[in-house]
Amino acid sequence: MRRHLPTLLIALALISAAGAAAAMQEQRFGPYDVRISEPSDGIWPGRLEILLNGRVVYRGSDRTYGFADSAPIGADLTGSREPMLAVSAYSNGGDCCFEMLLFGLGPQLRLAAPLPGGKSEGKFERTGGLWYYIARDWTFAGWKVDAASSPACRVVLAYQKSRWRLAAERMRRGALPGTLLNQLAAKIRGSERWRIKPSGEIEAYEPQLPTLMLDLVYTGNPAQAETLLDAAWPPKAEGKARFLRDFRRELAKSPYARDIRRLAKVSPPGESDSAETCERD
C-alpha cells in the first residue's frame, strides 16, 4: 500500500486542481482580466482579482463574489461613456448583506462607490437606453412586526448628477383614491392579527399597517400615509402618536431618506389604483 501512496496523492491533487479550476469564473474586457474564485466545496470566503495588462490592480478576499449577470462587463452604467464592471459581493455571517461593487474600466482602474443590496441581491435593468439599479430597502426589517412579515421596499436608482439617486420617473405614483384608502384602512383596523391589552397597550401589530404606509411614502405620498394611519388605527389601541414618531425616526435611517423626501415634491402622473412597492415577494 505504501508504494502506491505517491500515485494516490498525485491523483488527489489532480482532482483538487480540477475542482478549483471549475470554481473560477473569468471575464475579459480590453486590457482587463477579471477572475472570481470560489472553493469547490462552497466554503466562504471567495476571491476577486482584477488584472490590468496582466498585473493585479485589485484583490478582494473577504466575501463571496459573483459577476452581475444583469449588467455585462463594459456596460456604460452611468451614461458617462465609462465602461464599468459590476460585481455582487455577499458578506456571510450574522451581519450578512449583499453589496454591488462598481469599477470603472478606463485607462486606470477606478473603484466607484458601491450600491447597497441588503438582505437580497440587487440587479441592473436597461430601459429606454438608460441603466437602472433595482434593490430592496431593508431599513424596516423586524420593525414592530416579525422579520418574515416586515416590509422591504423596492427602490429603483438611476445615475444622476454624479451619484445614484431614486429614479422619480420609476418610483413616483399618484395618490390612492379616497374610497380605496378607506377600504384598506378598514381591513387593517379590523384585522385579527392585532393583539391589544385591555389597557390599550399593543402586543402585536397588523403588519399591513407599516407596509402600506411605506408603500405610500416610497411612491411620494407621505401625507396619505399618515391619513391611512389615522383611519386604520384601532379605537381601543394606545400609542398612535408614538408609533408615528418611531416610524419617522426609522425612515430617517434609510440610505434613501433624502431622495424619499424629494420624491414627494415631484408632480405625480395621476391617481393610482395601487401602491404596492414594499410587499415582499
Model-derived regions, located:
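Positively charged n-region of N-terminal signal peptides that target proteins for export
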Residues: 1-4
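Bacterial N-terminal signal peptides
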Residues: 7-17
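Acidic, small-residue rich beta-repeat scaffolds with periodic aromatic anchors
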Residues: 21-42, 132-281
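Acidic/hydrophobic-patterned starts of short beta strands in beta-sheet-rich repeat architectures
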Residues: 29-36, 76-91, 126-140
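N-terminal, Lys/Arg-enriched amphipathic/low-complexity engagement segments
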Residues: 36-65, 80
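Surface-exposed loop/turn elements that mediate protein-protein interactions on large endomembrane-trafficking
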Residues: 49-62, 101-115, 158-168
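Short, solvent-exposed aromatic-acidic interface loops
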Residues: 64-65, 116-121, 169-178
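Repeated scaffold domains used in trafficking and secretory/extracellular systems
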Residues: 67-75, 117-125
